[in-house]
């Protein structure tokens, strides 16, 4: 009789334990990142350095030893606050990113900081963005770049084991090149060369061939110097398309110079006048139109 009473009690206890196990919720980790500075952004290598405060709060114990920094490494960690429910660390890190150079040199990039739990998957621990403790210092300056936005969100990432994913807190900061410095540094020298070359069409002497040949070589050298600042990519950048139009313009002017020289040797003044007239009618409008169409693509 005693055994009959004990069995229902044991069964009820086992069922209750199983129910508790099935309803176990993952550990909630509130994470906030406040960036105090960025530096050494190298587009060619896709690397940058950063200093930021990492603030963690959770009902269960969590420390910096439980956190993995993705796509980078921590170079120094200083503990600011260390209480059971709240951790605050000042971290210096070297990070990497994948630059998008389609619009180079009017390119913009995202500087990401991503963290995840080293050992617990998303069924055991999940991140929640602590918006009150997330931000960017207003005095942060990255020479040659302008900050124009930031975001923070949580996502899950699956690694080699497709049945297991990890919660990841992602903080992104968007930068773009300063427009005025880009125009002065990249395009002003090229535009001066193009203007001089187009103005040479007004010259009716054969001496313009030497001028345009020099302008063509100067454009090649400037292009080589500018393009050397970025890695090799498998697509045409804005600068590449700009230089294609530039080479086409300079090439047409050089060809007209060669034709003019050949006609001058043949003493065919009528044909020289015709070549000069049609060169002025076709080359400048075509060149300006192509440049305008190219710059309009930046608005898309």
Regions found by a protein language model. Name each.
Residues 1-8:
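Bacterial N-terminal signal peptides
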Residues 293-300:
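Juxtamembrane boundary at the C-terminal end of a transmembrane helix
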Residues 2, 30-33, 93-98, 195, ...:
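Short, functionally important structural connectors and interaction interfaces within domains
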């Amino acid at each position: 009789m005693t055994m009959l009473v004990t069995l229902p009690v044991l069964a009820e206890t086992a069922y209750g334990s199983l129910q508790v196990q099935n309803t176990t919720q993952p550990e909630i980790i509130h994470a906030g990142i406040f960036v105090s500075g960025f530096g050494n952004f190298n587009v060619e290598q896709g690397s940058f350095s950063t200093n930021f405060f990492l603030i963690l709060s959770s009902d269960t114990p969590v420390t910096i030893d439980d956190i993995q920094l993705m796509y980078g490494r921590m170079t120094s960690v200083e503990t600011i606050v260390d209480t059971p429910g709240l951790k605050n660390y000042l971290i210096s890190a070297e990070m990497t990113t994948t630059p998008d150079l389609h619009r180079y040199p009017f390119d913009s990039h995202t500087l990401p900081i991503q963290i995840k739990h080293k050992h617990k998957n998303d069924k055991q621990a999940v991140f929640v963005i602590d918006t009150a403790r997330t931000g960017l210092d207003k005095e942060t300056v990255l020479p040659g770049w302008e900050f124009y936005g930031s975001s923070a969100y949580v996502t899950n990432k699956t690694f080699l084991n497709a049945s297991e994913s990890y919660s990841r807190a992602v903080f992104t900061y968007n930068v773009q090149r300063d427009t005025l410095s880009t125009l002065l540094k990249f395009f002003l020298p090229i535009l001066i060369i193009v203007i001089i070359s187009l103005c040479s069409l007004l010259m009716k002497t054969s001496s313009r061939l030497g001028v345009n040949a020099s302008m063509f070589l100067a454009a090649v050298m400037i292009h080589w110097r500018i393009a050397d600042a970025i890695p090799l990519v498998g697509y045409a950048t804005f600068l590449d398309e700009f230089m294609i139009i530039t080479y086409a313009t300079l090439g047409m002017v050089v060809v007209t110079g060669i034709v003019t020289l050949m006609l001058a040797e043949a003493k065919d003044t009528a044909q020289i006048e015709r070549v000069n007239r049609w060169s002025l009618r076709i080359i400048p409008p075509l060149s300006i139109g192509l440049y305008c169409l190219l710059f309009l693509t930046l608005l898309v």
